[in-house]
Structures are given as structure tokens and as C-alpha cells.
Amino acid sequence: MTTIYLDNNATSQVAAEVMDAMLPYFRILYGNPSSMHSFGGQVARKIREAREQAAALIGATPEEVIFTSCGTESDNAAIRSALATHPDRRHILTSRVEHPAVKSLCAHLSRQGYRVTELPVDKDGLLDMNQFERSLTPDTAVVSLMWANNETGALFPVEKAAELAHDKGILFHTDAVQAVGKIPINMKSNVIDMLSISGHKLHAPKGIGILYVRKGTKFSPFLIGGHQEKERRGGTENTPSIIGLGKACELAASNMKMENTRVKKLRDKLETELLERIPNSRVNGTRLYRLPNTTNISFEFVEGEAILLLMDEFGICASSGSACTSGSLQPSHVLRAMGVPFTMAHGSIRFSLSIYNTEEEIDFVIEKLPSIIERLRGLSPYWNLGDQACTVQ
């Protein structure tokens, strides 16, 4: 059975070019980049090249790129550094719809005495910027807002938010894990202090990430150890993955405009056809300010987990929320924050496409999903009691 993979916000296929770039550094050029000998020096030069490739994708300088193990580490390092470099400040400003990497950390820090404000979002998953500005206080050490939501694809105006934070002398961090490689980002044109990237969301391997730290920003290391990453992140470098991430960044920079236009057309076709063919369905979140690859659709009176299981019988892979929380039976915290009705939130499915998806795959999903929803609604007591007459809000 062929797999149709529409869960790319959870993880993505490693590009063939990325794998080819990595392979020599497992068994041939396996030296430690910190070694004095020329064998290690070859590896160090290749890491410098990867750092340049990553910096070019986001309009940064190579010195501003710190390689980490993942987006979660980058988020933790950024927020903890901001608190460590501003010990007199005890307030953190974030949103209710952040990824668990930020949300769970903030909950942990609140138990340690920090005051955390989680800004609400509207029905489209967007922030009220007036409320954001009012929430900035002299005690605020750091603002952490995602650039793009992993469940709905909604884009936050982080560049404007960073300016407002800077006006009050507050550090600004953004979790850009879902945004990098999908939309243009130029750190030279904004004042964001720190930005998180995860390799496996842009066709690099798992276990590698980046923390961008703007030149001049005070930084307190999260992992203490050796001198690696200019003493900003201890630990022997994950050379093959760093090189793979560099190559993935180069590919993303080259292909972004053309491929994302194609991916958006496929996403829009999937969305339009499903809404037309399946009654009592709706898109969750803004349809204007969002990633080109993501749609989150609710099918009322059915369980998202049941939809996923039946789609899986046809080889269709999607998600009922963040891959870091989808093991829970509770509705998505993102959709709850948006005020999505319970009967809709429980039946939400996130489809997230990549450059490797084809129109034939999208047509197959459009063909199969309506009958899956019809079958499940036939088993739903709410649907059978006549609630199907309800109008989707």
C-alpha cells in the first residue's frame, strides 16, 4: 500500500540531497571538528559551510547561528538565557497556543516563582496586538511567541511584536520551527533577538536544530561543557546532522518560492473540495495569514482519532493536533483557545503538505475522506439524533 504523507508539520522526509551530503561524515570523514589534526580540520570546515548555509536562509550572519539538538532545546535555551541575563525580572509573556516546548517550560517556570502571562487569541487564532502591548511591563524579562502555529498554520506578527518589546527594553524570542523554509525570513529586516529552528521540519534529519542569537544579545549557555559553538552550547558537534541541516537550508532557499506556490495550490484544492463534499465541516483559523502548506479542518460529530484510523487503512497520514500532544484524548489546546465548539474541536484533522506531495495524492484523499466521515457519522449518536441540521458557526 502506498503511503500518502500529509503530516509534514510533525516531521518531514529527509531530502535525498541531504542524505547524500551526510553519508561521508559517518564512516569516511568522521573526525572530531575540535581536533588539531587536519582530519578533524576537514570536518570543521564543512561545519562552517553548513553554518553559512543556515545563516543565508534566514538573512543572518554565521556567527549568529548556534547548532542545537532540536527546536525544544533551542526554545529552552532562549527563554532560560533571557531569564538568566535579566535576574531582576520575573515576568514572561507568551500565548495560549504555543508549542509544548514553550508552553510546558513556562508552566514549569511558573512553579518556580515566575509570573507567566498567556495571551488569548481570537476565533481566527490571531493575537490582539493592543492587548499584547498593554501586557508588556517593566518586570517582563522575555516575550516568546511562535512565528507560525503548528496546528492551524496561523502567522503571528512577530516582527511588529519584537519592535514593541524592544521599545520597552524587553528581549524577544520566536519559535520559528514551522515557519523557516516555508515563508521568507530575513533577520536583517527585524529586531528579533532569538529564533528557534528544527531540522526535521524542513527535510533535514531529526535530532538537529538551531538557535539564532542576534549579535550583541547577552546569552547564558543552556548546556555547559566544552568550548563548542563558541562556548554557547557544550557537547561534541553532531557533524552529519549539522551538514545535513546546512544542505536542507540551501535547498529551502533555492526552492521556496516555486515549491511553496505549488504546495499552496494543492492545499487549497484539498481544502475547497473537502468543504464542498462534506457537510458540517469548516477550516479552523485564519485563511489569510497562514503557512502555505497547512489546513486544519473540523468534521462535526466525529472523533478525530477515528478519522485518522480509517484514513490509515488507505495509507493516508495526517494528524489530530501537535505530534507532541496528539496522544491525549483532550481536544487541541490551540482549538480550545480559539473557542472552537467542542463537537468541532474533537473532529479536527490537520493536513500539512510538503514539496513531495502530488496532485494525484490530493485527489485520492478527496475521493476517500467523504465516505470515511459518512461512515463515522452513521455511528455517531449525536448525528443520528438530528444534530446534523446544526449550522456550522
Spell out what each predicted region is:
Residues 1-393:
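Pyridoxal 5′-phosphate
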